[in-house]
């Protein structure tokens, strides 16, 4: 192993590969980028925001070869001691991160029908990385595994039992790597005892979810069998009455596939506003008095507050509410409006602290005194994946989370 080992973190999406290279000793990011537009003539690779490199018609292995070439140019290839892969769905088979073996790959493939759009892409990334780095230990980190501590009453749907027992239909939850990282950071920031604590983490981005964390374990979460359930999101409807969808199908003649597209791609902030799924665009429109943009934001916030309050019922105590994700970290307006809804929980906002930019990093934004502490903690899923890889790979870990 090189004297200065690094972890390569890979996140293969349906049409892209996001990656980062982190120093094992510090978990500082040394290099990061994205290969996007896989299998199209417009595919490209961008490193550290530099000029894109043409990767026309490249598949996952081609793109990873290009990434490996960029590592070689920076004398980092021999330093790659570990590779961490983000895996979208682990089903009930994976309760924690694991070292990748042939058996693990077979088991990931078994649960992949639960998330076909992402898991098969994840597997393509694993296959390519194992081929390009055959001597490097590789680790799978599952977006669902943090939520495998949910009790049956929290994960079961009120459907006939055979759908659960035969098909695995249940709540799995997502954003687990983010919720796990942020809750761990919260114990330090808020000076809490992990073994006797209650947190609500609100991961708010284009995809959004709430997680109740009791004594260090996820006990409830808003996303379900798929990432569609729960909060209203950028283009996803979130919770919706199935009876309403059945009525729409009857009245319009739309198929199940049509309606899946509607609730996943045409709803949420975009659907209500008719303007954009980008909250930055909607906030500008909010201040300009755009009626439907204001209604979209109000609906988004109402759902956030309702889910935060509801998830508090899964805790034995409520010590803190944490905002994270692109919107949770950066939107002063969304945090302010959400906290105004949550006075019933004893939450009071410090308006000036809430206005601090995300460049300030981890910060408490509740007033003193406030019955419940509210904070903003920037998520770092890449770091959490790297830390899992370091731990499982038996490489000397940083003090943090060691």
Curated annotation (Swiss-Prot):
Substrate binds at residue 86. InterPro entries: Ac/propionate_kinase, Aliphatic_acid_kin_short-chain, Aliphatic_acid_kinase_CS, ATPase_NBD, Propionate_kinase. It comes from the Bacteria. Its cofactor is Mg(2+). Gene3D superfamilies: 3.30.420.40. Keywords: ATP-binding, Kinase, Magnesium, Metal-binding, Nucleotide-binding, Transferase. GO terms for biological process: acetate metabolic process; L-threonine catabolic process to propionate. GO terms for molecular function: acetate kinase activity; ATP binding; metal ion binding; propionate kinase activity. It holds the Pfam family Acetate_kinase. ATP binds at residues 11, 18, 175, 203-207, 278-280, 326-330. The keyword ATP-binding applies. The active site is at residue 143. One of its GO terms (cellular component) is cytosol. Pathway: Amino-acid degradation; L-threonine degradation via propanoate pathway; propanoate from L-threonine: step 4/4. Its EC number is 2.7.2.15. It catalyses: propanoate + ATP = propanoyl phosphate + ADP. The record marks 175, 236 as: Transition state stabilizer. Mg(2+) binds at residue 11. Belongs to the acetokinase family. TdcD subfamily. Homodimer. HAMAP family: Acetate_kinase, Propion_kin_subfam1. Catalyzes the conversion of propionyl phosphate and ADP to propionate and ATP. This is Propionate kinase. It comes from Salmonella agona (strain SL483). The lineage of its organism: Bacteria, Pseudomonadati, Pseudomonadota, Gammaproteobacteria, Enterobacterales. The gene is tdcD.
